[in-house]
Amino acid sequence: MELKGVQPSNGSANGNGTTNAASTEKADTEKQTAERTNWGNGLEFLMSCISVSVGLGNVWRFPFTAYENGGGAFLIPYIIVLFLIGKPMYYLEMIMGQFTSQGTVKIWSVVPGFVGVGYGQAFGTICIISYYSSLLALTLYYLFVSFQSELPWSYCRDEWTNCVNSRPQEYVDNLLTGVSLANESARNLSGIGFVANDETEKLQSSSELYFLNVVIKEKLDISDGVGDPDWKLTLALFVAWVVIFLVIMRGVKSSGKAAYFLALFPYVVLFVLLIRAVTLEGARDGILFFLEPQWGELLNPTVWKEAVVQCFFSLAVGSGPIIMFASYNRFDHGIYRDAMIVTTLDTLTSLLGGITIFAILGNLAHNLQIENIRDVVRSGTGLAFISYPDAISKFQAVPQLFSVLFFFMLFVLGIGSIVALQSTIVTIICDQFKGLKYWKVALITSACGFLMGLVYVTPGGQWILTLVDFYGGTYVVFILAIFELAGIVWVYGLQNFCDDIEFMCNRRVSLYWRMCWSFFTPVMMIIIFIYSMATIEPIKYSELYFPEAANIAGWLLFAIGAAQFPLWGLWYASTHPQGTYWKSLKASLKPSDRWGPANPETRREWVIFKNQKAAQRATQKSTSKLGFFWRKLTNFCGSNK
């Protein structure tokens, strides 16, 4: 279609004075773009994308997600999901950010009625930030105490009954002594402890008791509240937010430089840990346990759902960082190459992290003389702060060194992820209120992030983390990603979008991308979301169900995030009247005058290009129907003809 609403000289008449408003918004956008900072070079952008996409999701979440969902067989649905959902969504978000030079909210000038998608994603991002920072606090805590002459979780305290030390050999001796005194045939292995019989309490390792009793001071009943913040974790949380602020305070000028370290250092540590891990006794069994496929799990829909969730969590799609990072690129930057590098590297890092972690856990099972490695693996937070420390404490040579390396690596990975998420929020605010100084917004939002994080460093904090992650992070991000894709491909139109890509990248869009964006990606996401909603079960923490009030609060959290989409759409139609309200709604589904490249000269060239494309299609329609459909097919397939 001809772009009457985005002519460089004047906008379309919207009635009730909205033409002047649109012109003012357009002028503000062009002024902002002229002042918008770009990456120092393309490598800074690539390193930043790696630092957010290759993070805790690869080392912490992927290993236990894989082993819980078929082991090596999980790699098959994960790779399929990566190619049909992960890569297409990642590339699409890169394109949207770079094409418009705008953040997560402002890009919706393409379909103004969908602006609520951007605000909803911002809400989901804030939820993720709130608990992600508490994981950094835990990581910092373990990092600091790792400098002691003896790892504090490797030995029992006097007040801990039924505790066995996590020291090398002594742990095994104590454990085997406990076994010999009990009815071995009645053993019920659970985690890294077990129940000897009905009258014997569960033996627990010192690493588990240290985490539960010393670090988080776990509270198993939150009906009377979550308790007060722990001062040590509060201090660690404060330090984490100071580091985050220092990295983002100057925008991409500072975060771009930090990205080199944030992206590359974890690989150095990961390779060091890998070399050490594969040389440990029992490592081979752990690796085989991780990679051995359970083919029956491929027919389990839950496995496919978990593959999608892991893909979103790992690549950070649907929450805004990729759009935000790409918005600071030059218009002609080669993002196709970067998208392929990051998504491929993300998968390889997940495999590398899984092999490393399960090699360590294999050694733990060997030391405990436990045949089933499943019995030493904990999911969630316990994997990073119980199973890993327990395994490291059994290293014969300088376990303190490997503990420092491991937790510093986790901290760097977490910083890389949260810097991107926090920068997304700062960019949204600065795009909306152009007179604000970036560093001031970064300071205020960092202070707010610290205050929100306090609830997670209380004795009941892990309950809140589980609740917010489930309702406010996973499901909000997922449903809004569906709306994001639908708005661009189905409402704005696949052909329009592909024309924009061709103009920006100077290359036709291949059949693979067209098929994924128009069919495979949205259909798979919709089916998986419906299945997830239909089979959803009450969430639990530490095998305990949440109180009914907590579940209600969780659903309210989800409703607030998802409701941003329709509410902001109705608001836009109300504030941009086009006669009747129905006409206003229809108009909100068409690109506004602000849509397109932000640079005025590039914008003029784009308008000419789009109008030429519209003229070509108008000419094609006047030919025979057979020829018309043939040309439509070749256009869809990305032919250059």
UniProtKB/Swiss-Prot annotation:
Functional description taken from the UniProt entry: Unusual broad substrate spectrum amino acid:sodium cotransporter that promotes absorption of the D isomers of essential amino acids. Neutral amino acids are the preferred substrates, especially methionine and phenylalanine.
Region span, Disordered: 1-34
Low complexity bias spans: 9-24
Segments of skewed composition (Basic and acidic residues): 25-34
Membrane topology of the entry: Multi-pass membrane protein
Location of the protein in the cell: Membrane
GO molecular function, one term: amino acid:sodium symporter activity
InterPro entries found in the cross-reference section: Na/ntran_symport, SNS_sf
Keywords, alphabetical: Amino-acid transport, Glycoprotein, Ion transport, Membrane, Sodium, Sodium transport, Symport, Transmembrane, Transmembrane helix, Transport
Transmembrane region(s): 39-59, 72-92, 109-129, 229-249, 258-278, 307-327, 341-361, 401-421, 441-461, 474-494, 516-536, 552-572
NCBIfam families: Na_transp
Name of protein: Sodium-dependent nutrient amino acid transporter 1
Entry's Gene Ontology cellular component terms: plasma membrane
The organism of origin for this protein: Drosophila yakuba (Fruit fly)
GO terms for biological process, alphabetical: amino acid import across plasma membrane; D-amino acid transport; neutral amino acid transport; sodium ion transport
